[in-house]
Design a protein with these regions (language model features):
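Basic, Lys/Arg- and aromatic-enriched nucleic-acid-binding interface segment
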Residues: 51, 56-108, 112
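A short, basic/aromatic helix-end/turn motif that makes direct DNA contacts
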Residues: 113-118, 222-228
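Conserved tyrosine-mediated DNA breakage-rejoining catalytic core shared by Y-recombinases
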Residues: 12, 59, 113-149
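N-terminal core-binding DNA-recognition domain of tyrosine recombinases/integrases
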Residues: 1-68, 83
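Short, contiguous acidic/charged loop-to-helix segments that flank catalytic cores in large enzymes
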Residues: 85-87, 125-135, 168-177, 195-202
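Active-site/catalytic core of tyrosine-dependent DNA strand-transfer enzymes
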Residues: 77, 140-195
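Short alpha-helical segment immediately N-terminal to, or the first helix within
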Residues: 21, 99-100, 114, 210-211, ...
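Short, basic (Lys/Arg/His-rich) helix/loop patches that form interaction surfaces
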Residues: 82, 86-88, 182-223
Length: 229
């Protein structure tokens, strides 16, 4: 939660950052990308400032791995939607996964930050926090049903994920919620006929994969998901 001085960067700090990225549900290749970028910045600073190299990235994962399957079929999506779940946390995690899928793979951060004002004239209109691109999605009853089940905690946000009046910062709330949801989704993976572990990112990748199987042009899928061109 604070800035880290160059002299404080060691294997312990880098290891803690790597663990944080893993708990965020990022893939190994994405973690490697972040680590390599951070290492390049560190090496540049060491060279320009002529300071000792403490080699903080000696134990960090900086390789690339073969990408594993990260999408589930429409059949599996239906199985997940039809599950009779016992606990609130299970229902909440499942429904947010489905909400992401219904909204063309919306990221968890964007879902959490949605406000009631984002729904206008039958459309969900929002800007991706990652790219700033504005997206418009037709508002469906399936989305409204989920919103109705998890009402706003503060009267401002669309879903009951973040609370402006809580003691913890919105960033802390997002991190806690995302970790809990991904942990719960991992357990739900065993209840349906799939061979991968569910995360919020799987919802995003599943929408893109299933759209592609319906012969939706890749360019349209990319635009729909808010990718930078």
């Amino acid at each position: 939660q604070k800035d880290i001085l160059l002299c404080e960067l060691d294997e312990l700090v880098v290891g803690a950052y790597e663990s944080y990225l893993k708990h965020q549900g990022l893939t190994l290749n994405t973690i490697s990308f972040y680590m390599r970028r951070l290492r390049a910045i560190y090496n540049s600073a060491v060279k320009e400032l002529e300071i000792p190299d403490r080699k903080p990235f000696a134990g960090a994962f900086t390789r690339t791995t073969k990408t594993s399957k990260r999408a589930i079929s429409q059949k599996a999506i239906r199985q997940l939607a039809q599950l009779k779940l016992e606990t609130y946390n299970q229902q909440f995690a499942r429904d947010l996964f489905l909400f992401s899928y219904y909204t063309r793979g919306m990221s968890f951060v964007d879902i959490a930050c949605l406000e009631k004002s984002n729904i206008r004239n039958g459309y969900l209109i929002y800007k991706r926090r990652k790219t700033g691109q504005e997206l418009r999605i037709a508002w469906r009853q399936s989305m409204q049903d989920i919103v109705d089940r998890y009402p706003s905690l503060d009267g401002k946000h669309l879903l009951g994920i973040l609370d402006n009046h809580a003691e913890k910062s919105l960033r802390q709330q997002r991190h806690y919620r995302q970790c809990l949801i991904n942990k719960t989704l991992k357990k739900l993976s065993k209840l349906i006929d799939i061979d991968i572990t569910l995360t919020m990112y799987v919802a995003r990748h599943s929408w893109a994969t299933n759209a592609k199987e319906k012969n939706v042009p890749v360019s349209v899928i990319s635009d729909s998901m808010g990718h930078n061109s």
